[in-house]
UniProtKB/Swiss-Prot annotation:
It comes from Aeromonas salmonicida (strain A449). Residues 9-68 form the Sm domain. GO terms for molecular function: RNA binding. The lineage of its organism: Bacteria, Pseudomonadati, Pseudomonadota, Gammaproteobacteria, Aeromonadales. GO terms for cellular component: cytosol. GO terms for biological process: regulation of DNA-templated transcription; regulation of RNA stability; regulation of translation, ncRNA-mediated. InterPro entries: Hfq (IPR005001), LSM_dom_sf (IPR010920), Sm (IPR047575). Keywords: RNA-binding, Stress response. This is RNA-binding protein Hfq.
């Protein structure tokens, strides 16, 4: 797994698990709102009245509606070695 995903995956997974509403801002300035239904290496499935597949390369910022507790012990955090993890 890429080092950049060692923060991304636990953060997105906490948003998904806790069904926290999010605002996703795209690089072109468009704001999308909903709940993260699922995600993988390349896309986020955002659910509102419909489900939208949003490509991660088009995302600028993900803003949760409330604070997120994503600080679980994750192998690879604080410079530890990390193996392949599930999303």
């Amino acid at each position: 797994m890429a080092k950049g995903q060692s923060l991304q995956d636990p953060f997105l997974n906490a948003l998904r698990r806790e069904r926290i509403p999010v605002s996703i801002y795209l690089v072109n300035g468009i704001k999308l709102q909903g709940q993260i239904e699922s995600f993988d290496q390349f896309v986020i499935l955002l659910k509102n009245t419909v489900s939208q597949m949003v490509y991660k390369h088009a995302i600028s910022t993900v803003v949760p509606a409330r604070a997120v507790n994503h600080h679980q012990h994750v192998p690879g955090a604080a410079g530890e070695e990390q193996g392949e993890a599930e999303a």
